[in-house]
C-alpha cells in the first residue's frame, strides 16, 4: 500500500513536491488555503486574505533556463525574464501536464499537525484541516511543508523612535500592488532588497519624490551581462565554481567589485556597502538611472520620525513625507505545529541540510523551500522534494537524529559564545548546495564520466550554465530529454529575441568561442583535482590565498 503524504501549500515548491510523490509511487494530498495554485505568484488586487502576493509590475530576477523545473523547460518563445502572469502560466502548464490538480484540496486551511502516539514506531502524523467551516482529521505517513518563508510581514516599528507620531501613511510592501494612489506624494522606502528597489523605481514615475533608505547598501546587478546574455547563465557555471575554490577569495572579490563598479560607481551613487557589513546583491536594471536623474534620492538609515519628517543617521532631515513603505522582509512560522517542534523548525541550524528537523525519531517531516540560494529557489526546492520523497520511501538514508541534534546544539552554543559566526541567514552557493543534495539522491553529474562518454555534453555541463537539467542526466529520476535540453538551452534563450532578423549582419563571437581557447587546460586541471581528495583541493587553495593575491591584483592593474 502506498504511503500517504500530506503536502502543505500548492505554490512553486508544493507543485514539485506533489509531482515527486507521484514519481515515487507515494500518495499525495495537497492542502491549499487559497482557491488556486501558484502561492505568491498568483496576483490579486489586495492582500486582504493575509497571503503574500506579487505586486503587479514584478519581473523575475532569474532567467527562464535557470528557473524551470528540471524535466519541464519553458517554451522557447517565453521571454528570458517574465512578468508574474507569464510565470504563473508556466506553473499552470506544469500542473496540467503532469495532472497534479487532482491531488489538491483548495480553500483548505491546515489547523494542526501532531505526532501520533505511536510515532516512534510508525512515524505517522495526525493532520487536522478546515474547509468551509468544517474540520477534518486524517492520518498521514509523512508531511511536506511547502509554505515558504514569505509568510508574516516584518514591520519593525519599535526600531524607529517617533514612528507613532507620524501622521502620514505607513504600510508594508506586502500591501503594495500598483503605483496609482501615490501621485504627487513624497514617499520614503525603507529597506533596499529586490522589493525595495523595484517599488522605489516604479514609484519614481508617479510620486513627486522617492527617498530610498538603506543601512548597509548593496551591489546592483543587471539582468543582462556580457554580450547581452542573461546574467545568471553567465556566472552560474561549474568552471566558475571551480575557479572560486582555487583562487584567493580576496582576489575574486576585488575582480567582482571592479566589474560591478565598471557599470557605475556604487559609492558615487550612495549604494556602496557600509564598512563592516556583509556584501549583498539585488537585481535592478533601472535603479542607477533613477538615481542619476534625481527621481530617487539615496538616504542613510532613519533614526527618528516626527509628525511629518524623517531624521537620518547622517544628520539630514527630509520634510513633508506623505508615505512610508517598509520593505523589511518577512518572518516565517509554523502555527500548525506544537512546541518544541514549532520553535525548532524556525532555526535553520536544526534542519538537516535545511530540510529535515533534527529532533524527530523518524524522518517523516520535511520543510521544503526554507532556504536562501544564490540562484533559483524553484530548482532548489524541486531537488529537495526529489530527495525527501526518496527518504520517505526508504531509498535514501539520513544520519541518526540524536547525533545530528547533538552536533547542532553544540554549534548553537559556540555561536552564542562568539566562537562561530551565525551563517544561518546567509545565502548558500547555488551549485554547491544543489550538488550536495544531488549527491544524496545519486543524481550529481560526474564530469569525468561525462567527458569519457559524451565530450560535447561534458563541455556544456562544465563550461555552460548549470541549468536544472543537469540533475536529470543520470541516477534516479533520469530524464531522456535532459541531454537535448542542455544542448539547446542557448537556442531557447535567443529565440524570443529573434523578432527582427537583419540580413548579413555581423554576429559577435559567442562565449563558447572564447572558452575553447583556454577551456581545455582548465578542464584538464579540474578533472585532476576532482579525482583527488577534497583535502588536496583545500591545501592548494590555502597555499594560494596569501601568495597569489598581491601578484594577481598587480598583474590585473597592469
UniProtKB/Swiss-Prot annotation:
The keyword Transmembrane helix applies. The keyword Oxidoreductase applies. Pfam families: FMO-like. NADP(+) binds at residues 60-61, 195-198. This is Dimethylaniline monooxygenase [N-oxide-forming] 4. Its main location: membrane. The chain crosses the membrane at residues 517-537. It comes from Homo sapiens. Liver. FAD binds at residues 9-13, 32, 40-41. It is found in: Microsome membrane; Endoplasmic reticulum membrane. Keywords: Endoplasmic reticulum, FAD, Flavoprotein, Membrane, Microsome, Monooxygenase, NADP, Oxidoreductase, Transmembrane, Transmembrane helix. It catalyses: N,N-dimethylaniline + NADPH + O2 + H(+) = N,N-dimethylaniline N-oxide + NADP(+) + H2O. InterPro entries: FAD/NAD-bd_sf, Flavin_mOase, Flavin_mOase-like, Flavin_mOase_4, FMO-like. Belongs to the FMO family. Its EC number is 1.14.13.8. It is an enzyme of class 1 (oxidoreductase). GO terms for biological process: energy homeostasis; negative regulation of fatty acid oxidation; xenobiotic catabolic process. GO terms for molecular function: flavin adenine dinucleotide binding; N,N-dimethylaniline monooxygenase activity; NADP binding. It is a single-pass membrane protein. Its cofactor is FAD. This protein is involved in the oxidative metabolism of a variety of xenobiotics such as drugs and pesticides. One of its GO terms (cellular component) is endoplasmic reticulum membrane.
Amino acid at each position: 500500500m502506498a504511503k500517504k503524504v500530506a503536502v502543505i501549500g500548492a505554490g512553486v515548491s508544493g507543485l514539485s513536491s506533489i509531482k515527486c510523490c507521484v514519481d515515487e509511487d507515494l500518495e499525495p494530498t495537497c492542502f491549499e488555503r487559497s482557491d488556486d495554485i501558484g502561492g505568491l505568484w498568483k496576483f490579486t488586487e489586495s492582500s486582504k486574505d493575509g497571503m503574500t502576493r506579487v505586486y503587479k509590475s514584478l519581473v523575475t530576477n532569474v532567467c527562464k533556463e535557470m528557473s524551470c523545473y528540471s524535466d519541464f523547460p519553458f517554451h522557447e518563445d517565453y521571454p528570458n525574464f517574465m512578468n508574474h502572469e507569464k510565470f504563473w502560466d508556466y506553473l499552470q502548464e506544469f500542473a496540467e501536464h503532469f495532472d497534479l490538480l487532482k491531488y489538491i484540496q483548495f480553500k483548505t486551511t491546515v489547523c494542526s499537525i501532531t505526532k501520533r502516539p505511536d510515532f516512534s514506531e510508525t512515524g505517522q502524523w495526525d493532520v487536522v484541516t478546515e474547509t468551509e467551516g468544517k474540520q477534518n482529521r486524517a492520518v498521514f505517513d509523512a508531511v511536506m511543508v511547502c509554505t515558504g518563508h514569505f509568510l508574516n510581514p516584518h514591520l519593525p516599528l519599535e526600531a524607529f523612535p517617533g514612528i507613532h507620531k507620524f501622521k502620514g501613511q505607513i504600510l508594508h510592501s506586502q500591501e503594495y500592488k500598483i503605483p496609482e494612489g501615490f501621485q504627487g506624494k513624497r514617499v520614503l522606502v525603507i529597506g533596499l532588497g529586490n522589493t525595495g528597489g523595484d517599488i522605489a523605481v516604479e514609484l519614481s514615475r508617479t510620486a513627486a519624490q522617492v527617498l530610498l533608505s538603506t543601512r548597509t547598501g548593496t551591489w546592483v546587478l543587471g539582468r543582462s551581462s556580457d554580450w547581452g546574455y542573461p546574467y545568471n547563465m553567465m556566472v552560474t557555471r561549474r568552471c566558475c565554481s571551480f575557479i572560486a575554490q582555487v583562487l584567493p577569495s580576496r582576489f575574486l572579490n576585488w575582480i567582482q567589485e571592479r566589474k560591478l563598479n565598471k557599470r557605475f560607481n556604487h559609492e558615487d551613487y550612495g549604494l556602496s556597502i557600509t564598512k563592516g557589513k556583509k556584501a549583498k546583491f539585488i537585481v535592478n536594471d533601472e535603479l542607477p538611472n533613477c538615481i542619476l536623474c534625481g527621481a530617487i534620492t539615496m538616504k542613510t538609515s532613519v533614526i527618528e520620525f516626527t509628525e511629518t519628517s524623517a531624521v537620518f543617521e547622517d544628520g539630514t532631515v527630509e520634510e513633508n513625507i506623505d508615505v512610508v513603505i517598509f520593505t523589511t522582509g518577512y518572518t516565517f512560522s509554523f502555527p500548525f505545529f506544537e512546541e518544541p517542534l514549532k520553535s525548532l523548525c524556525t532555526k535553520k541550524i536544526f534542519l538537516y541540510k535545511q530540510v529535515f528537523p533534527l529532533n524527530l525519531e523518524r524522518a517523516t517531516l520535511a520543510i521544503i523551500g526554507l532556504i536562501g540560494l544564490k540562484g533559483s529557489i524553484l530548482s532548489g526546492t524541486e531537488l529537495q522534494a526529489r530527495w525527501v520523497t526518496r527518504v520517505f520511501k526508504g531509498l535514501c538514508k539520513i544520519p541518526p537524529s540524536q547525533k545530528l541534534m547533538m552536533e547542532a546544539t553544540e554549534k548553537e552554543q559556540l555561536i552564542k559564545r562568539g566562537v562561530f559566526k551565525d551563517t544561518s541567514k546567509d545565502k548558500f552557493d547555488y551549485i554547491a548546495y544543489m550538488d550536495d543534495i544531488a549527491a544524496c539522491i545519486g543524481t550529481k553529474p560526474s564530469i569525468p564520466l561525462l567527458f569519457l562518454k559524451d565530450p560535447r555534453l561534458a563541455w556544456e555541463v562544465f563550461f555552460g550554465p548549470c541549468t536544472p537539467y543537469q540533475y536529470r542526466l543520470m541516477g534516479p529520476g533520469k530524464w531522456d530529454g535532459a541531454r537535448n535540453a542542455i544542448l539547446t538551452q542557448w537556442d531557447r534563450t535567443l529565440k524570443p529575441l529573434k523578432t527582427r532578423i537583419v540580413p548579413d549582419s555581423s554576429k559577435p563571437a559567442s562565449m563558447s568561442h572564447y572558452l575553447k581557447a583556454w577551456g581545455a587546460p582548465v578542464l584538464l586541471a579540474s578533472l585532476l583535482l576532482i579525482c583527488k581528495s577534497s583535502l588536496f583541493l583545500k591545501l592548494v587553495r590555502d597555499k594560494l590565498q596569501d601568495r597569489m593575491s598581491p601578484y594577481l591584483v598587480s598583474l590585473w592593474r597592469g
